[in-house]
Amino acid sequence: MSLNLFKTTVNDYLEGLPEQVQSRLYESPATCLAIYRLLSPMAKFFIMSMLFQDHDVSLRDLDKWVKPDAKYQLQYSIKSMKSLNLIIEGESKQPLLIRLNPIFKKSFKNVLTGGEINNSFGDVADDDTNPVSTATLDQYSAEKWETILHYMVGTPNTNTPGGKVLDLLQHSGLMEEAEYGELKITNQGFQFLLQDVNAQMWTLLLQYLKMAESLQMDPVDVLNFIFMLGALQLGKAYKCDQLSNTQRTMLQDMRDYGLIYQNQSDYAKFYPTRLATLLTSDTKAFRSASVALDSVLNKANETTAVEGDSGQDETTERTQDGALIIETNFKLYSYSNSPLQIAILSLFVHLKSRFANMVTGQLTRESVRNALLNGITAEQIIAYLETHAHPRMRRLAEENLSKKLELDPTVKETLQVLPPTVVDQIRLWQLELDRIISYDGYLYTDFESYQEYQTVADYAKDIGVLLWQNEKKKMFFVSTEGNSQVLDFHRRNFDK
């Protein structure tokens, strides 16, 4: 999932809130800043243009500011701002005149001008004599977040997340109950693993919001706290005494997700982790918590930078992300030492060897069928392979496409990163599975006459338990649930 798509998902939730709830949200300057960051560039421009205007603004004026080929973006931005209740009808009540929501306008002005913000951005604990290092915060948040991901993919010998986290995973449809009460990953869960860390966090937090509403928790308090976390400063301690009862309850849950850290000896303060600061960040999305944290730490440790090193760093980041090469013979090489990435691969790849910085395996009919039977689709497997393809595979695909375009500029082929034979075979394995559906039931044969066969088969069809029949061979198949009814019917009418 791209960063834009995750923003759209958050906006969809916010747009669906009642106007009264939206207005209460805008009383918090930190929330106003976070929502502003989630808007499209054009909507941001309109907000800034109207922020210091004391009179109504005409929609015709906004239309004049936009190029003719950007009318769709204009309509989308206006619709989004209206749905969020950021713009309302002008004071003059004349058509086509609008103004900023006065509550949002006041709070957002305070953000930009340093006005009254009422601890909206947290209350810093000045008496923090033993601060927690950023390295400790980074390690803590990565362990907590990736514990959740490891549990989802079934990595052996890993810790189990807290009970509330498991409830959330099940409630959100990312995992479902299997045999013996254990949880297993679902189709949606595998799609969740394909997302970047920002989208993963917001996916769970939006489900947390829905669960919070059913638990009678104030959604405004919940949202304000989440948006506040995204605006706090890494490495600073913040007091808990200004938090509402709802937000105090959230502290334990946010600890389980790795968004905040608290010393066991001092629960009066909390520290936001780097994952929390990414919640409303406009920086690029990362594929995992480890990659996000390692990227920041690597930049902090750099003392010199040359052009050659830059390319090496980029390759290293991709390698940490599990860059892989797949051949036409279905052999796969993944340059990763991450247990999480290896566990995800094991869901649909038959792994053979593991080295210090690489694992090898092969896509087989059985390994892919096992993934398909567990709810993972062929398109999701293909998407994962494309997303994590090695830069050299992408470069080779681009070169091949360029050569085809040179020979025939009208060619309509798209960039094929993966070997076509591999992509086609994965889809064929799914089609093969879709053609075969198994049912438990009973086969009826050896009827004395065609009339006897037809009468019993028609009865089975009428009561909806007939699954298959062959008139030439005078046989049919009924479900387990309907077998007793068909037997009783046969005894009443044909047994002497």
Curated annotation (Swiss-Prot):
Keywords for this entry?
DNA damage, DNA repair, Nucleus, Transcription, Transcription regulation
Q: Which domain of life is it from?
A: Eukaryota
Q: In its UniProt record, which GO terms are filed under biological process?
A: nucleotide-excision repair
InterPro entries in UniProt: Tfb2_C (IPR040662), TFIIH_p52/Tfb2 (IPR004598)
What's a GO cellular component annotated to this UniProt protein?
A: transcription factor TFIIH holo complex
> Listed GO molecular functions?
ATPase activator activity; double-stranded DNA binding
* Subcellular localization: Nucleus
Q: What is its main location?
A: nucleus
Instruction: Spell out the family assignment given in the record's similarity comment.
Output: Belongs to the TFB2 family.
Q: What does this protein do?
A: Component of the general transcription and DNA repair factor IIH (TFIIH) core complex, which is involved in general and transcription-coupled nucleotide excision repair (NER) of damaged DNA and, when complexed to TFIIK, in RNA transcription by RNA polymerase II. In NER, TFIIH acts by opening DNA around the lesion to allow the excision of the damaged oligonucleotide and its replacement by a new DNA fragment. In transcription, TFIIH has an essential role in transcription initiation.
Q: How does it assemble?
A: Component of the 7-subunit TFIIH core complex composed of XPB/SSL2, XPD/RAD3, SSL1, TFB1, TFB2, TFB4 and TFB5, which is active in NER. The core complex associates with the 3-subunit CTD-kinase module TFIIK composed of CCL1, KIN28 and TFB3 to form the 10-subunit holoenzyme (holo-TFIIH) active in transcription.
Q: What is this protein called?
A: General transcription and DNA repair factor IIH subunit TFB2
Tell me the organism.
Kluyveromyces lactis (strain ATCC 8585 / CBS 2359 / DSM 70799 / NBRC 1267 / NRRL Y-1140 / WM37) (Yeast)
Organismal lineage: Eukaryota, Fungi, Dikarya, Ascomycota, Saccharomycotina
